[in-house]
Amino acid sequence: MASLSGSISSLFLKEFVGAFFLSMRYFFRQKATINYPFEKGPVSPRFRGEHALRRYPNGEERCIACKLCEAICPAQAITIEAGPRRNDGTRRTVRYDIDMVKCIYCGFCQEACPVDAIVEGPNFEFATETREELYFDKARLLDNGDRWEREIARNIAIDSPYR
C-alpha cells in the first residue's frame, strides 16, 4: 500500500508542483537585494564608520587635546600629542593618529569627546590595498571631517535627544 501511495505521488509530481507554487509566490514579491556598487542601502544616523576630526564653523579644529578619547579607547588605537598652551589658555593637538587596524569601531572615543571633535562618520567604503594606508594622521582625519561635515552634523542633530 505504501508503494502504491509513493507511486501515485511521484506520478503526479506532488513535490515539484508544491515547489513550483512556492517559487511563484516569492517570484512576484518586491526584491530584497540591491545592486551594491550602483545602489546603496540606507545607513543609520548612529552608524560608526570612518573616523573624522571636525572643525568649528570658523575653520579652527575642535580638538582641545584633553586626551579622553585616547584614555577610553579599549584597543589603544589613538595616539595624541598636545601642543603648548596658547595665549588664550587652550591647547591643540600637534599629532593625532588613529591606527584603524587596531580600531574596533566601538564609538567610545566619540562618546568621550566633550566637544564632538572626533566622530565616526557615515563612510563605510574605505578599503585599502596596504596596511599603511589604514594609519590615519591628523591631516587625513581633518580631511574626512571636511568631506563629511554636512552628514555628520545632521546625524549628530538627529541623535542629540538620545545623548
UniProtKB/Swiss-Prot annotation:
Reactions catalysed according to its record: a quinone + NADH + 5 H(+)(in) = a quinol + NAD(+) + 4 H(+)(out)
GO molecular function terms listed in the Swiss-Prot or TrEMBL record: 4 iron, 4 sulfur cluster binding; iron ion binding; NADH:ubiquinone reductase (non-electrogenic) activity; quinone binding
A GO cellular component entry from the record: plasma membrane
Domain (4Fe-4S ferredoxin-type) ranges: 53-83, 94-123
Record note on cofactor: Binds 2 [4Fe-4S] clusters per subunit.
UniProt-annotated location(s): Cell inner membrane
Annotated Pfam families: Fer4_7
Keyword list, A-Z: 4Fe-4S, Cell inner membrane, Cell membrane, Iron, Iron-sulfur, Membrane, Metal-binding, NAD, Quinone, Repeat, Translocase, Ubiquinone
Annotated EC: 7.1.1.-
Chain positions recorded as [4Fe-4S] cluster 2 binding sites: C73, C103, C106, C109
Top EC class for this record: translocase
Cofactor: [4Fe-4S] cluster
Binding residues annotated for [4Fe-4S] cluster 1, in chain numbering: C63, C66, C69, C113
Membrane topology type: Peripheral membrane protein
Domain of life from the UniProt record: Bacteria
Subunit structure: NDH-1 is composed of 14 different subunits. Subunits NuoA, H, J, K, L, M, N constitute the membrane sector of the complex.
Name of the protein described by the UniProt record: NADH-quinone oxidoreductase subunit I
Organism: Rhizobium johnstonii (strain DSM 114642 / LMG 32736 / 3841) (Rhizobium leguminosarum bv. viciae)
